[in-house]
């Protein structure tokens, strides 16, 4: 008989809506013992079967649902089906947009909670972020090796969230050859260098692909400031869009060095590109005091908020940085501003930008809205999957 997690009375509603999480406060009791990550059955207070899930005893999210089908077993065949289903959508996207790199598995939205897999050419980069994902590592890797014999697999499970699940960080080769120090990928006509072994996340921010492409329509003959530039994807796109100048700002010299290489790799005019190692908040104030102005500013900061207790402080940070950017824009300028904080709703982010405009003494028109690229889907039952949001703002 399988181990069962029994829900408290009335706490089954989210599962009936097919939301994939069970929080610790919804649990009445456990029937039987299971190891961290082991598969358990979830039942309501009357014993009615609801879902099959992975147990996370160290986490506030006590269980993550693998399936709502009572006849489905969690094994290699299960992971193979999920991977094949996800691949169908990515095949269409890759062909339509000419991509050789994309997010193959986007966690809960692809029916594999705690699992992130990015494909860069013939390298699969794996992040296992939950106890269940880690427990099922052998089955998942076996399914990947069978479906993608041409691909090497590299683990980037060096993410702090694993500690909340009671797990150590993990990084290194899983199978096949080691990735090169920098791997060139293609995106909307750009070649971009990716550091799989040491870069942010899995090596690159694939989720901003569509936003980078959209930048081109705003930048012709414009002076562009690219804040939190990382390896310069927005800068390369701006140069391909015909900008007059683009200044990329980041605190990491290594990232800026790769950004410069990306400009050179695409045979673009390096004299139009400047790379500044500095703190964005400090530099924006310095530019303001010096009377510098720009026609387009890209504001793509890291996540400011990890939990609800940090939300208020994050709102202040987002407002401050957007106010400074708006102050630096010429009349008729464009602000492309983003938040990758999942706890920051689109409506709240829009209000923050509006408040920033008020504080800057400028009128702003919202002219375009952005979200994560289509290989980062959001399943209807899990709206938390929409974490990246952004706006193009016309500053008057």
From Swiss-Prot:
Q: Which UniProt keywords apply?
A: Cytoplasm, Methyltransferase, RNA-binding, rRNA processing, S-adenosyl-L-methionine, Transferase
Query: Does the keyword Transferase feature in the UniProt annotation?
Result: yes
Mind naming one GO cellular-component term on file for this protein? cytoplasm
Coarsely, its chief localization is: cytoplasm
Catalysed reactions listed for this entry? cytidine(1962) in 23S rRNA + S-adenosyl-L-methionine = 5-methylcytidine(1962) in 23S rRNA + S-adenosyl-L-homocysteine + H(+)
Q: Where in the cell is it found?
A: Cytoplasm
Please identify the protein, giving its name as recorded: Ribosomal RNA large subunit methyltransferase I
Which HAMAP family does the protein's record reference? 23SrRNA_methyltr_I (MF_01857)
Q: Where is the PUA domain?
A: 2-81
Assigned protein family = Belongs to the methyltransferase superfamily. RlmI family.
Entry's Gene Ontology molecular function annotations:
RNA binding; rRNA (cytosine) methyltransferase activity
- Chain's role: Specifically methylates the cytosine at position 1962 (m5C1962) of 23S rRNA.
Pfam families, A to Z: Methyltrans_SAM (PF10672), PUA_3 (PF17785)
UniProt lineage: Bacteria, Pseudomonadati, Pseudomonadota, Gammaproteobacteria, Enterobacterales
Q: Which organism is it from?
A: Cronobacter sakazakii (strain ATCC BAA-894)
| PROSITE patterns referenced in this protein's UniProt entry, alphabetically | PUA
Per its UniProt entry, which superkingdom is the organism in? Bacteria
- What Enzyme Commission number(s) appear in the record? 2.1.1.191
């Amino acid at each position: 008989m399988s181990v069962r997690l029994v829900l408290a009375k009335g706490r089954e509603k989210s599962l009936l809506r097919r939301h994939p999480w069970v929080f610790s406060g919804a649990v009445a009791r456990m029937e039987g013992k299971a190891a961290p990550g082991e598969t358990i059955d979830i039942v309501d207070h009357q014993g009615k079967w609801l879902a099959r899930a992975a147990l996370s005893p160290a986490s506030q999210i006590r269980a993550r649902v693998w399936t709502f089908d009572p006849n489905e077993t969690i094994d290699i065949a299960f992971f193979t089906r999920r991977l094949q289903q996800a691949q169908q959508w990515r095949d269409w996207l890759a062909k339509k947009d000419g991509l050789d790199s994309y997010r193959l598995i986007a966690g809960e939205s692809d029916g594999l909670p705690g699992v992130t897999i990015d494909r860069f050419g013939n390298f699969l980069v794996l992040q296992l972020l939950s106890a269940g994902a880690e427990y099922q590592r052998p089955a998942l890797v076996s399914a990947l090796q069978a479906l993608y014999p041409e691909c090497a697999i590299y683990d980037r499970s060096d993410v702090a969230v694993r500690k909340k699940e009671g797990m150590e960080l993990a990084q290194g080769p899983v199978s096949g050859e080691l990735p090169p120090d920098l791997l060139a990928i293609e995106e909307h006509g750009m070649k971009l260098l990716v550091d799989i072994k040491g870069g942010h996340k899995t090596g690159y921010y694939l989720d901003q692909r569509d936003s980078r492409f959209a930048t081109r329509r705003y930048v012709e003959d414009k002076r562009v400031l690219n804040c939190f530039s990382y390896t310069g994807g927005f800068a390369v796109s701006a140069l391909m869009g015909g900008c007059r100048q683009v200044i990329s700002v980041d605190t990491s010299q290594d990232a800026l060095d790769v950004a410069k290489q990306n400009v050179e790799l695409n045979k673009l005019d390096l004299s139009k590109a400047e790379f500044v190692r500095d703190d964005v908040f400090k530099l924006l104030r310095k530019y303001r005091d010096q009377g510098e102005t720009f026609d387009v500013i890209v504001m793509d900061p890291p996540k400011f908020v990890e939990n609800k207790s940090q939300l208020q402080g994050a709102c202040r940070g987002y407002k401050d940085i957007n106010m400074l950017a708006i102050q630096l824009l010429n009349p008729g300028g464009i602000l492309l501003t983003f938040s990758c904080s999942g706890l920051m709703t689109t409506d709240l982010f829009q209000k923050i930008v509006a408040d920033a405009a008020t504080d800057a003494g400028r009128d702003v028109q919202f002219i375009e809205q952005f979200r994560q690229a289509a290989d980062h889907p959001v399943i209807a039952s899990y709206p938390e999957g929409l974490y990246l949001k952004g706006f193009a703002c016309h500053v008057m």
